[in-house]
Amino acid sequence: MRSSAKQEELVKAFKALLKEEKFSSQGEIVQALQDQGFENINQSKVSRMLTKFGAVRTRNAKMEMVYCLPVELGVPTTSSPLKNLVLDIDYNDAVVVIHTSPGAAQLIARLLDSLGKAEGILGTIAGDDTIFTTPARGFTVKDLYEAILVLFEQEL
């Protein structure tokens, strides 16, 4: 088996194990992967993979501290469309407010800033999961709101 195919299988198995939310130590993850035929896996590799994929320790339904990859904390990949990170778009008399998945606001705000004044965007302010966007001169807040809806293929 090619090295990259083997690596993909390892990543797939690793993520599947974490979805089970029953592993409380890196040693348990190592053992489970070895049981699946990944003989060369060790604690150091598991530790790097946990960091790479943003795994966290949290309490499962049985109140045990376990490793998991929460969907909402997942790192956006090149295959995940940005529109999937936008949860809600609304506006008032002053600004358009965009709610995103946790951690995605700065990425989305950077995209909006890159479109600039020609698209009606004066600027953005982004937190972790919320963006304030204000219209450029000559555009109304409602114009900007509708343009952002179209950009992220949301319903009017």
Swiss-Prot record:
It is found in: Cytoplasm. Keywords: Amino-acid biosynthesis, Arginine biosynthesis, Cytoplasm, DNA-binding, Repressor, Transcription, Transcription regulation. Disulfide bonds: none annotated. GO terms for molecular function: arginine binding; DNA binding; DNA-binding transcription factor activity. InterPro entries: Arg_repress, Arg_repress_C, Arg_repress_C_sf, Arg_repress_DNA-bd, WH-like_DNA-bd_sf, WH_DNA-bd_sf. GO terms for cellular component: cytoplasm. Pathway: Amino-acid biosynthesis; L-arginine biosynthesis [regulation]. GO terms for biological process: L-arginine biosynthetic process; protein complex oligomerization; regulation of arginine biosynthetic process. It holds the Pfam family Arg_repressor_C. Regulates arginine biosynthesis genes. This is Arginine repressor.
